Every structure is written in C-alpha cells, then in structure tokens.
Amino acid sequence: MSALQPLIDTYLNHIASQRGLSPVTITNYQSNLAEFVALLNENKVGCWTELDGQLVRLMVKTLHKKGLKARSIATKLSALRSFLDYLVQFDILSNNPAKGIAAPKLDKPLPKNVSVDDMFQLLDIDEKDPLSIRDQCMMELMYSSGLRLSELVGINLQDIKLSAKEIMVTGKGSKQRLLPITDRAVATVKIWLKIRPEFCIKDEKALFVSKQKKRISARNVQARMEKWGLKQALPGHINPHKLRHSFATHMLESSGNLRAVQTLLGHADLATTQIYTHLDFQHLSKIYDQAHPRAKRKK
C-alpha cells in the first residue's frame, strides 16, 4: 500500500460519517483520488507534505495528455482540492496546493447550425420599415461572409465596395481580411444605404447605426436577431454566432474545401476550423469519394 493511502482512507471515513454521503459518492471520491496517488507514486512522492502547486499542475497536465476530457479532470481536481482542504483543517498541511489551480477549459458545445431552408426563411423578411431593412441587411451580410459579431458592428462605409462585391473586415488581433459578399447581400446593402442618412448624424462612419444615430452595439444586434428568429418561427434561438457557424457548415458542405473556409472565417489555425464546423460522417464520406483518386472505381 502507498504511504499516501492511509490519510485518504481516514478522509473517506470522515466524509461518509460526517456528511452522510452515499457509498456510490464515496467510491467516486476514492476513484478520483486514486488517480492522483498513482501519479504521485510515479513522481516518487511519499508524503502529502511534499505536494506543491507545481506537482498539482504537472498531474493535471498528465491527465490531459492521457486524453481525459476537461470535465473529468475538473471533477478529479475538485475531489483532490476537497481532500487537501481536509488535511489543512487537521493541520497536516499548512495550505492547499491545489487551490487556485484550474482544470483545462471545458469544451464549449458548438451551436446547432441553421439549416439552409430555415436560413432562407429567416432572411425572407416582408416588413419594409427602416429597422427591418437594416436588420435584414445585417443578417444577410453576416451569413453572406461568415462575419463575427464584432466584425459586423465594426464595418465602416469605406470598408464595403458594392461594385466589386467585397467587404474589408477587421478580425481578432486587428487582422484585416477581404471577403466576397453575395448578390443578395449587395442588394440589401443598397436598399439600406438609401435610408441610412435618416438614422445617423453627419460624418458617422459606421455602416450600421441604431435609433440613437450612432454605431449599433453588439448587444443590440443580438437582441434584434433573437427577435427575428422568433418572428420568423425558426426552431431554437437565433444569434450572430449561429449565423457564422451556419455559414461555415453550409460552405463546407458545398465545397468540401476546409482551407478556403478557414480563410473566409479568419482562423489562424486550421484545427480551429475543423472544430468549428461539423459534418455528418455520410457527408464526409461523399466528399472523400468525390475527391480521393483511389476512391473512384472504374465501372
């Protein structure tokens, strides 16, 4: 038995009696702590007083390298932190070396993309009042070019070239990229530009403005898109990120060109684009059969 185990056994008996935890919960605590004991034994640590923050970070890193998901590591780290708090409480340790050490960031689930049919339904707006025209234009541009919310609100008049059907946006790290825009987006921008002067003060640079006659805020855009999602009877909530995600998925489904989608989205790393988009296996197999020279069999 490891020299580290007796204090764990004492701790498990303590929480079983004092906190009335179920046998299943106690077993989970025991299992989580056992992984740390194994790692400490590998690092020749024979006493809990030898544990420090650097070792805790090393163990977290090791678990991550072994392929454990962020949520599992967070659960194990929480169990270790509680155990070390117990050791501090009974003066075995002077401080908790796991306090303040975070698990890897939890993987954020991707938003469900909007289907092509639902996207057409969202953008098929009948209302012709100025705010509706502006909102339709914002959503058309976002879906047309896969814009981030910050990129959309940051667009200035000088950034858009309708004759060339292109727009310059400023992304993360102040990096600029030139993007194509669809004919439909060009048409809605032209309509918006005709009525825009009614909304803004003289010399306002922003393409999209609010009723306060200044650049529209990100929060305002989010609220307006959510409103249109409800009004157009779309399933689920509509938000700017979902439009960007849908653009990426639809483009990848149509082209199968991950590199091109990476460039359009402004991702520095291709891995980000791979995570950002999701295609079902059937569609990926179809792209593979069309693209791989050895997948094309002679009939």
Curated annotation (Swiss-Prot):
Coiled coil: none annotated. Residues 2-88 form the Core-binding (CB) domain. One of its GO terms (biological process) is cell division. The active site is at R148, K172, H241, R244, H267, Y276. GO terms for cellular component: cytoplasm. Transmembrane segments: none annotated. It holds the Pfam family Phage_int_SAM_1. InterPro entries: CB, DNA_brk_join_enz, Integrase-like_cat_sf, Integrase_catalytic, Integrase_recombinase_N, Integrase_SAM-like_N, Recomb_XerC, Tyrosine_recombinase_XerC/XerD. Keywords: Cell cycle, Cell division, Chromosome partition, Cytoplasm, DNA integration, DNA recombination, DNA-binding. One of its GO terms (molecular function) is tyrosine-based site-specific recombinase activity. Residues 109-289 form the Tyr recombinase domain. It is found in: Cytoplasm. Belongs to the 'phage' integrase family. XerC subfamily. Site-specific tyrosine recombinase, which acts by catalyzing the cutting and rejoining of the recombining DNA molecules. The XerC-XerD complex is essential to convert dimers of the bacterial chromosome into monomers to permit their segregation at cell division. It also contributes to the segregational stability of plasmids. Forms a cyclic heterotetrameric complex composed of two molecules of XerC and two molecules of XerD. This is Tyrosine recombinase XerC. The gene is xerC.
